[in-house]
Each structure stands twice: as C-alpha cells, then as structure tokens.
Amino acid sequence: MTVTGIIAEFNPFHNGHKYLLDHAEGIKIVAMSGNFVQRGEPAIVDKWIRAQMALENGADLVVELPFFTAVQSADYFASGAVDILSRLGIDSLTFGTEEVLDYQTIADVYSEKSEEMEAFVESLPSDLSYPQKTQKMWEKFAGVDFTGNTPNHILGLAYAKACAGKGITLNPIQRQGAGYHSLDKEVSFASATSLRLHKEDSNFVDKFMPNSKLFQTSPQVSWDNYFQLLVYQILTNPDLTSVFQVNEEIASRLKAAVREISSVEELVDKVATKRYTKARVRRILTYILVGAVDNSLPKSIHVLGFSQKGQFHLKSVKKSVDIVARIGRKPWDMLTQQADNVYQLGNPELCEQNFGRVPIRVK
C-alpha cells in the first residue's frame, strides 16, 4: 500500500486541508507543526486540537515537528519534515501549491547539480535575503518563474530539494480557492489567514471548517497574548545574541524599537529590512519568547494521534524508528517542551501539553 506523507500546520484545519487529504493515497502520515508555526507565531489552537481535526478528516497518523524544525525558513522546515516522514516509510509526498509544475523534474535537477546550485547561492550579494537568493537559484537552474505571493509554491520547491535522491514521489495538488494569505470571505475555499482573522464569525467558520465546533470551543491564542512577555524577554535579557539567530545588528534594532511599539506587528515592521524579512524577524521573536538557543534535533518521533491504519503502520516501523507516545515516561525534546510551557501561558484554559498526554485514537 502507498504511504503518503503530508507536511502541514493546520493553523487552523480547513476545507482546503480536507481536500488535500482526500486526494492523498494510501496510508496518510502528517508531519505537523507543534504549538508554534513556520512563519513565527503561536498556533491559534494547540497541537492536540489540530491533530484531532486532521485525524477526523482522513489522516491516519499525525506526528509532531520539533520546535527547531517547525519554526524555520522553508528549506530547513522542509528538510526536517521530510527526514521524519522518510524514517516513517513514506514513498510519496502530497502538498498543495499555487503553481502545478513538474516538481519531480525540479528535484532531479537539484539532485544532479546540488553543489553547483548551492555554490551559486553563496556567491550572491549579502544584501539579498536568503529567500531572494533561493529564488534566483531556481530561476537560473530550473527555469522556475515566481509570480506574486506564492508561499506554498516556495515550500513545494523546498520539498523538491529535500526529497531529491530519496526515492520519494512528489504529488502536487493545485491549491483551491483563496490564496495563502488572502482575507477574502467570498471564495469556495477560505485561507487559514482569513479564518484566523474572522474567527468570531461563526457562520463563516462553519462554512469553511469541517471541525468548526471543535475549533470554536477550544482555547485560542495569538501573538497578542504573548506581547507583554516578549517585551519583558527583550528588555531583561542582558545578551540577546545568546538566543538562536540573534546577531548584534538584530539585537540592537530590537532594543531600540521595543520601547516605541504597542504590538508584535509594530515591532516586526520596525526591525525588518530588505535583508531581514518580516517572516525571519517573527521567527527570531519566537526564539526570544521561548528562550531558544542552538540545539540538536531529537532522534525520536513524537506521535500525536492515529487511526487504526496508522497504528498498524506504527507497529510495522517501530523496530527501526524510535517512537515516543507518552512524554514523561520517555523524554523527547526539551526545547519543544519548553516552548509548550510558554505557549500555555497565553490562555489559562489551555490544557497541559505534554506530561500525561497520550496519542489521540480515531476509529
């Protein structure tokens, strides 16, 4: 049977995600961000709720991306997620994209010319951001065009790069309805961004989310819930450069700006430059919030939930893969658990995120 991998955040889970799961084949394994997501912000509902949403809509197994995989630029995010899915035995990767290209051929190009392509990236001017350098690499070596705001397409290229030479078949699915960051409510499939913005509109949420009641009754958070704590962390840390990816320039810009702002987005706007993108600044603020220092990734894989098919698949790979089903009996990743502790501070109604929690089972 085909084993299909899906890399996701489900922030929150919506009809577009269900469409993706419906078009995936065989056993469907999801590698999902935990309580903080790739663009550098807390997930609107916790990882357990989002895993349950996925399992109730077609996923067979949901595993957690460690913090240092989940909150990273596209290449590192993709590489870490593909590594986990590869160890779980996937033979195909299904993903949504705004541009349906031959990603398999693109992966082959990278497999053949990776050294030359990475050398090209290194040769580009330092005032370019890493995403800009990567786009120039794909344009030059694979003839890829970039039109407008296409974050899923950029992730698709990162997946192609991560899967190169691994024997994993790439299965792109045309993104349906609104664009990734679209705020439009008059569409066939609403974006996660739009659902977060209009979360109080129950009719809108009901229309575009298969698990709308679960979402609406679950504790929710946003950056606003952590703003004061973030300001405290910036003001009281004597050496911000001890935090992952914070250099002297970023530290200086943060210290200068933090007393002049009243929201995280204002801080992002003041600190971001052409070289330091807003997404990168948000990730850095997330590292500061949770006190992240450079850390190795865990070798074991944390399971959030499974169906019966997913449970059978886990049994078939457990001899070759170190699986953690209950944190406490067995340690997993201290940084992710530290981040979860901070996440819980955002809403007093949030449940314990690790100790005593067991995988969700869906029949």
UniProtKB/Swiss-Prot annotation:
Q: Could you say which residues form the signal peptide?
A: none
Enzyme Commission designation: 6.3.4.-
Keyword Ligase belongs to the record: yes
Name the predominant localization. Answer: cytoplasm
Q: Which example biological process does GO assign this protein?
A: tRNA modification
Instruction: Report the enzyme's class at the first EC level.
Output: ligase
| Protein's UniProt name | tRNA(Met) cytidine acetate ligase
List the top taxonomic levels of the source. Bacteria, Bacillati, Bacillota, Bacilli, Lactobacillales
